[in-house]
Swiss-Prot record:
Keywords: Hydrolase, Magnesium, Manganese, Metal-binding, Protein phosphatase. SMART domains: PP2C_SIG (SM00331), PP2Cc (SM00332). Mn(2+) 1 binds at residues 91-92. One of its GO terms (cellular component) is mitochondrion. Gene3D superfamilies: PPM-type phosphatase domain. GO terms for biological process: dephosphorylation. Its cofactor is Mg(2+); Mn(2+). This is Protein phosphatase PTC7 homolog fig.
């Protein structure tokens, strides 16, 4: 019988070494623990007057918009906790603007996700609950925050070396291993370019008028990670303008790299490239191709949109423990 050797998971890679340090010092143990090296970058949708919107009605193409200073605000990345790393993005749906409502007001809910992730009760194995808590908080406000937003949250549980995900709408995540896509979220839409969304409608309106999806509808997954894996979380502004193969090529130089500066430079390049493609009038973007597949009139080119990306590399760090032997 032949046995195939596969690359072990982070859990099996964690090693403990012991060293006797002499009387009065005792036994010193060393172990390896996984963690994420993270970087964030954002770019706002261009406001150039010569840019034209795709030929879709507002009902079939809700626009996304935020002021230039707010693009990075849509991403949150919690400070590393003892047991988990959390990161994610939220993308306000801009179709509300036609009704006099600024959907940007809903985006601070992503900041609340950061707060909830810091609580001792936070369960890294259930990021969907994180969305539920933030959504419930927004609905309970004395003055409700009106609007809607897509969201993607991932939590890296260190003890299991597992990535737990919760994705609602057309934002999403990609996990890259050895230059190939290991796993990728699938967008949730009611129909073309109408994503699932967490909505807080006007209190005096008929709820049936709106797409009011629930956090429980977020797709949840679990995936074991290995050292050098890359985890990317982004708004649809990236995926609508950059094909998968181009993304893989741009990130190939940082596969296995754990320096924060290099990760930051890589995510900067990805966002800048996607932004340039979004305003290229002759570029056949992924969004353009999907529009044609769905028989939606589209003039061609990229899709001008806000772009927010969080990129992380899985690394191992040695941790030292001392015993008190005499």
């Amino acid at each position: 019988m032949a046995f195939m050797r596969s690359k072990p998971s982070l859990g099996s890679l964690a090693r403990v070494a012991f060293r006797w340090c002499g009387p009065g010092v005792g036994l010193v143990s060393y172990s390896q623990e996984p963690y994420l090296v993270k970087a964030v970058q954002g770019k706002s949708k261009p406001r150039s007057p010569h840019l034209t919107s795709p030929q879709c009605s507002p009902e079939h193409r809700p626009r996304r918009f935020r002021p230039p200073s707010a693009s990075g605000r849509t991403a949150f990345s919690s400070a590393p906790r003892p047991k988990a790393d959390v990161m994610g993005v939220a993308d306000g749906v801009g179709g509300w603007r036609d009704r006099g409502i600024d959907a940007r007001a809903l985006l601070p809910g992503s900041d609340r996700c950061f707060v909830h992730a810091q609580k001792p009760t936070f369960d890294a194995r259930n990021p969907r609950q994180l969305l539920s808590e933030c959504y419930g908080e927004m609905k309970r406000k004395w003055k409700p925050i009106l609007g809607s937003s897509t969201a993607c949250v991932v939590a890296f549980n260190r003890s299991e070396s597992a990535l737990y995900t919760a994705n609602l709408g057309d934002s999403g995540y990609v996990v890259i291993r050895n230059g190939s896509v290991l796993d990728r979220s699938e967008e949730q839409t009611h129909f073309f370019n109408m994503p699932f969304q967490l909505t807080v409608p006007p209190p005096d309106s008929n709820r049936e008028m709106w797409f009011c999806d629930d956090p429980s509808e977020a797709v949840a997954t679990r995936l074991l990670l290995q050292p050098d894996d890359l985890v990317l979380v982004a708004t649809d502004g990236l995926f609508d303008n950059m094909p998968e193969q181009m993304l893989l090529e741009m990130l190939s130089k940082v596969q296995g790299v754990h320096e924060q500066k290099a990760i930051q430079e890589a995510v900067n390049r990805v966002v800048e490239r996607a932004g340039a493609l979004s305003i290229n009038p002759i570029y056949k973007s992924p969004f353009c191709l999907r529009a044609l597949e769905n028989n939606v009139p589209y003039g061609g080119g990229g899709k001008p949109d806000d772009i927010t990306v969080v990129l992380a590399s899985v690394a191992m760090t040695p941790v030292q423990y001392r015993g008190g032997f005499q």
